[in-house]
Amino acid sequence: MEDSYKDRTSLMKGAKDIAKEVKKQTVKKVNQAVDRAQDEYTQRSYSRFQDEEDDDDYYPPGETYSGEVNDDEGSSEATEGHDEEDEIYEGEYQGIPSTNQGKDSIVSVGQPKGDEYKDRRELESERRADEEELAQQYELIIQECGHGRFQWALFFVLGMALMADGVEVFVVGFVLPSAETDLCIPNSGSGWLGSIVYLGMMVGAFFWGGLADKVGRKQSLLICMSVNGFFAFLSSFVQGYGFFLVCRLLSGFGIGGAIPTVFSYFAEVLAREKRGEHLSWLCMFWMIGGIYASAMAWAIIPHYGWSFSMGSAYQFHSWRVFVIVCALPCVSSVVALTFMPESPRFLLEVGKHDEAWMILKLIHDTNMRARGQPEKVFTVNKIKTPKQIDELIEIESDTGTWYRRCFVRIRTELYGIWLTFMRCFNYPVRENTIKLTIVWFTLSFGYYGLSVWFPDVIKHLQSDEYALLTRNVQKDKYANFSINFTMENQIHTGMEYENGRFLGVKFKSVTFKDSVFKSCTFDDVTSVNTYFKNCTFIDTLFDNTDFEPYKFIDSEFQNCSFLHNKTGCQITFDDDYSAYWIYFVNFLGTLAVLPGNIVSALLMDRIGRLTMLGGSMVLSGISCFFLWFGTSESMMIGMLCLYNGLTISAWNSLDVVTVELYPTDRRATGFGFLNALCKAAAVLGNLIFGSLVSITKAIPILLASTVLVCGGLVGLRLPDTRTQVLM
């Protein structure tokens, strides 16, 4: 009887062991199937295995299968239940320690529903929570990495890119006078050259900023700077005006991505207490770019001897050398940028934990070695990564031909950029975007509007002063003479010239009124702003002159001959003094920004971004009223320097605030949109203020003051980001 009872007990125990093992293996197989499906959906290869414990420990500690009998006998788990599939991962790379992204989101027996069963609102809510946790953790990690050699190296690399943007703004204004004559640009088309660059920069800022949030800061910056450098070099060699316009358009399109990408990139490797100051120091490179362009223009463009020609079809003048020299900062930044890593904050945002961890370790080790502490260990093991939400569909390889796949890829990327841009108007950044839009537009409109108004007013004052020095010659007669010198700023009225020779004469701002030329010869004559009004020419020979029909107004010709008229466009001697003056004024105006840059960098983290932004814009608006007293060139130049020095603090603080208000997933996109709006406001300001130069001072002064003060008051309503971590 006792033996029979023992047999039944052993049989029950064996049956329970078998049932337990069957259930365990069933649950294991279900979880493995879900794991594979999850891996295929999320494209993870190993992260789910990082904190996965042994399969035999499926039941939590202290929890046993109901009805289980405790025994000391060897279980079948010691020799059975070994799954050969587990051997696939033995000895393989298990990844750098990261957050629990393994089975937390996997649907399994008795666990919460997985991501595929959640609606988008729930997923976005979880992602926001993850981003808040990541922001706090990332700030601590950056503080542990310290501020040192890595940040300074990146500072100079990104500074070269920002310098290239500053150069691009000045290049067209400096080469325009020379390019107009060299490329035969008509007066009606000269304005296109200045506007086309801003148009390219406007489109480029939006596109490259959006792309930086998709493919990364480094990748986007490399591409956009390469585009700028290539077409900037190409523009120095093209001959036709149309090709030159296209090259400058594409060059502007490339450089448009520099500002939004550079500031987003650099801000993401700076700790909170360093961010405001060092972003302000970075702004100084834009000023250096302006100084570099002014100095190079001053040194190169007036040297007409620095030119060569290959027949009459190809002309390479000094202004083309200047264009090449101005492309050097861009090329330097591209070369240096290839040695820098991607932004670790961006990599964490897109779920690339391991790459971000290695870059953060690189930053830490680089700074520690520079401090003489190479033994210090990077203690971070796990970094939170936000939940990834699929938005776009991956293109399959069988999508038609290669060009169709390329077209679909471009369209998909553009659609993704547009979706990111629309999210800039979603909660919680919608109100900030609207306020930033107002501040960016008003500051750009007032700054660039007055920037073009100042030189035009100075030029207008120069013209008035030049007119006062005009020499008037009236009712005189010259016979049997020969002239071979330059005639400048003269008006000849009622004159009579007989049997005279004008040999190699350069006429500059000379007007002949009611005059008679008898048996005269004009040989190898060049003229600028020279006209013959109501004049009579008798038996006169014109040989190798540039006298176009429009220079003869109501004039009469009797038995006259025109031989070998000069064709094409030559670099003229016009405005040699004015060219130097333009370079000098721009040089001083750009140099005046230096004190404002230093002050803003030192006080950015002390008095706050908003105080500096609002105060600088209000003071700039008030300073406009001093223009009432600008009655001379020197006074206007002084006002220009004062105005530039005050507004630079507003620009620096606005850049810092914009970077800090947007979260990482839309930071470059939002910055790019606002920078594109800045360029549109600049074009509008140039048109409006440029049309008011010769009318009155009152309208430009009141308009600029009102716009700047209103923008400054709106800027004071923005959130203070001085104590916030970078989201």
Curated annotation (Swiss-Prot):
Pfam families: LD_SV2, MFS_1, Sugar_tr. N-glycosylated. Residues 1-57 are annotated as: Interaction with SYT1. PROSITE patterns: MFS (PS50850). Disruption phenotype: Small interfering RNA knockdown of the protein in Neuro-2a cells (which only express this SV2 protein) prevents uptake of C.botulinum neurotoxin type A (BoNT/A, botA); uptake is restored by expression of rat SV2A or SV2B. The modification Phosphothreonine is found at residue 79. It is found in: Cytoplasmic vesicle, Secretory vesicle, Synaptic vesicle membrane. GO terms for molecular function: transmembrane transporter activity. The chain crosses the membrane at residues 155-175, 192-212, 227-247, 249-269, 281-301, 321-341, 438-458, 579-599, 610-630, 637-657, 671-693, 698-716. Residues 1-154, 213-226, 270-280, 342-437, 600-609, 658-670, 717-727 are cytoplasmic. It is a multi-pass membrane protein. GO terms for cellular component: dopaminergic synapse; synaptic vesicle; synaptic vesicle membrane. Glycans are attached at residues 480, 484, 534, 559, 565. Keywords: Cytoplasmic vesicle, Glycoprotein, Membrane, Neurotransmitter transport, Phosphoprotein, Receptor, Synapse, Transmembrane, Transmembrane helix, Transport. NCBIfam families: synapt_SV2. Plays a role in the control of regulated secretion in neural and endocrine cells, enhancing selectively low-frequency neurotransmission. Positively regulates vesicle fusion by maintaining the readily releasable pool of secretory vesicles. Interacts with SYT1 in a calcium-dependent manner. This is Synaptic vesicle glycoprotein 2C.
